[in-house]
Amino acid sequence: MDKISIIPIVGVALSLAIILQLGRTYWRLRHIPGPFPACITNFQRVGWVKTKRAHLILQDMHKKYGEVVRIGPNMVSFSNPEVIPTVYPARSGFPKGDFYVTLRPYTRGGGALHAVFNTTEEDLHKQIKSPIAPMFTPANTPSFEGLVDEVLTCIHEKLDENFIANSEIFNLGQWLQYFAFDVMGTMTFSKRYGFLDTGKDVGRMLGTIVDFMRDAAPMTQIPWLDWALRKNRIGDSIQRLFGKTASLGILGFVGKAIKERQELLSKGDFKVSDEKSGRKDFLTRFIELQQNDPKIPPWAPTAWTFSNVIAGSDSVGSLMRTTMFNLLVYPHTLEKLHDELRSAGVSRPYPKWSEIRNLLYLDACVQEGARMHPPFALPFERVVPAGGITILGYYLPGGTVVGGSPYVVNRHRETFGRDAEFWRPERWLESDEGHKRKLEQGVLTFGAGRRVCLGKHVGILEIKKLISFLVLNYDIRVVNPEKFELENSWFFFQRGLYATIRKRPDAVAVKNQQV
């Protein structure tokens, strides 16, 4: 048989193999409703993400097809919070899907960098999470208050200097983001990045994170394409050629900071941020943990610091903007919060954590902000273990990828009410503690189970401190709220929160208060 006659045979064989694979893929989940293209390809999901409004498209899919929807050949989405304990259990066995592999920055020397939030290997996750978990517990959260107060003092000064005197319209959302990043800079490196001091995106760090997520988000829907196009030497060279080096910029910043700190520690020249308490920043703790435990991989401090820089700052800033925007758009809730803070005798200008941590309406506002616009708005993907599971009457065989989008799940009307699309903090105060607990368990904003967000409690401290500070000290009015825009590129980016600001008549001047 000559070569020419073999070619058609090979072509037929390949075609049959593809048809059989497509048939097998279709057959496994044929009982799950969903759009027809989802049976054969994930490319329509890439298209959804590229619109930057995938959360709304997925919400429409659930309205059309029900609470369980097939959105890819092997991908199922759910919208009912009832499923959360099944898909995101406290035990191991439901590993993260390859979605998260695309969120690992690529380095030529060490390949893709694993971090607590993006590793899919459960043993590795335990290895790199366990050493740092005690730093983020509720009991340890108050230890960060002094660092937050340092940055509160800075934003207080800058708002008074730049915007109080002339009553000009300014980008409040941008300054909230600056605050979140400078807080994390202080916690991680013992110094602010300089966003508040300069009023600018220092070193274009914020822009770099946006670029990184915009590049990564479409790839999350077809992870093998990410490897083929970006996570190899050839793909990486092409990315560099076209200037697609966002992850390298972030890693470069982190690597430089770690190297400088290691040198200072080895010489004994580094001084802690708060010498009275002897409190160490995150970076020093990370380095010492790795040096004192040979089981911790040498790249762990880089991974931990990378997570702080990206997830620990942008997500908190997003929740600050969401909560503040809705308070301003619904002024009766703003005044209700102000009344609670004043009635509780909260310190001014800088509220104390002990005074605000258990305030009911403040907590309801923060809970509602986290529910309304979670910082991450694509499904949190998990792989069904061998033996399969049944959710809401639908059987999912082992190997199926399943997940819920926090944006969609958090708006489940049967759980959160017919007005679930709207801001109403009072929903968290209705009925009894059992009702509130049900709502809390139904919110997917911070994840759930064994992979719940590690920095949740620290983030809530930052948010409550800042919101209380702003509400107590300033009369803020939103300008053109219709310009407030949302972009879903895995991270939920927001733009256009403009406002005017003036001192409340009874506000305390910055110079009259010591922290």
Curated annotation (Swiss-Prot):
Its main location: membrane. The chain crosses the membrane at residues 3-23. Keywords: Heme, Iron, Membrane, Metal-binding, Monooxygenase, Oxidoreductase, Transmembrane, Transmembrane helix. Its cofactor is heme. Heme binds at residue 453. InterPro entries: Cyt_P450, Cyt_P450_CS, Cyt_P450_E_grp-IV, Cyt_P450_sf, Cytochrome_P450_monoxygenase. It is an enzyme of class 1 (oxidoreductase). This is Cytochrome P450 monooxygenase mfmA.
